[in-house]
Each structure stands twice: as structure tokens, then as C-alpha cells.
Amino acid sequence: TYEMDFDNLEAVCDAHCKMLILSNPHNPAGIVWSRETLEKLAEFCYEKGLVVISDEIHCDMALFGNKHIPFASISEKAAACSITFGAPSKTFNIAGIVCSYAIVPDENLRKRFYSWLEANEFGAAPIFSSIATIAAFRKGEEWRKQMLAYIEGNIEFVESFCRERIPQVKPLRPQASFLV
């Protein structure tokens, strides 16, 4: 299993560190982080004054009964120090639709983020992208469920194939996403 190395994180995080990028669920390892891990990370980042950029683009792709936990939902401290990014591109297979979203619960951090967006000339997404994103989230749930079942079937096929034909290879079953 793969776990966050908090001892190493403590060792490398000095006064120059301002930000931590979290892949939640982890990609490419396919790990759905536990509540305990996220709580510990939130406490660490809040105490160190780090902004957590939580990439949650695979959040709707938890597999085999696993449940994604949004980082900002862990605690008030997590919400106060995080910006969560997501997009419909992975879940709904619409990578050509250039659209993403950011959730910034803390008002002060949100103001800083919006100021950064304006300074770097990041405007609104094209209207077609916004419409496609809304349609995907409103109308795509049945498609998403079928896609997850298909991915789980592919993973089970790979596990079976390896077990029967190349037993030296023991694939790790992902808890989220689509990589084995």
C-alpha cells in the first residue's frame, strides 16, 4: 500500500514553502485517501501556513465501493487553507471541453485567488464549455455509473489475466480512476 510520508513532508517543508499540491484521489496510484490521512495533512498545512491545491479531477471515479472525501470537507482548517480544482473531462470523457472549476471556501483566500486569475488574464471558459459541463453533471449520472462498471470489469480482467497467465505480475487494484 502507498501512504503519505509525513516525516519526509516535515523534513522538506521549510519557511520557503507556500503551497502543497494534493492529488485527491491520487493519480496515477488510484488511492482514495483516508479521512485520517486528510485530517493529518490539513492540520499540517494549516499550522505551516500552506495553501493546499487539491486536484480532485478524479473525484467522481471512485471504484469498488470506495468513497472520495473532498479535502475541504475534512475540517474548518482544511477549508480555510485550500483551493479545490475539478473538471468534467475525466469523469465524462470530454477532455476537448476546456472547462474546470475551483472551490475556494475561505473568503480571504478566494479574494487572493480571484486577484491572481485577473492578473494572469484567466477569464471565463467559452460558453459551449460551460453548457457541456452543466449538461454532463445534470444528465450524465447513468453514463458515469456504466463507465465505472466498465472500468471495474477491465480491472478484474487484468487481475484475472495476470493471475492465470503471468502470476509473477501482481497488479495493484486501484481505488479510483482507471489505471492499473
Annotate the PLM regions:
Residues 134, 149-159, 170-180:
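Conserved glycine-rich beta-strand-loop-beta hairpin in the small C-terminal domain of fold type I
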Residues 107, 127-149, 160-166:
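Amphipathic alpha-helix from the class-I
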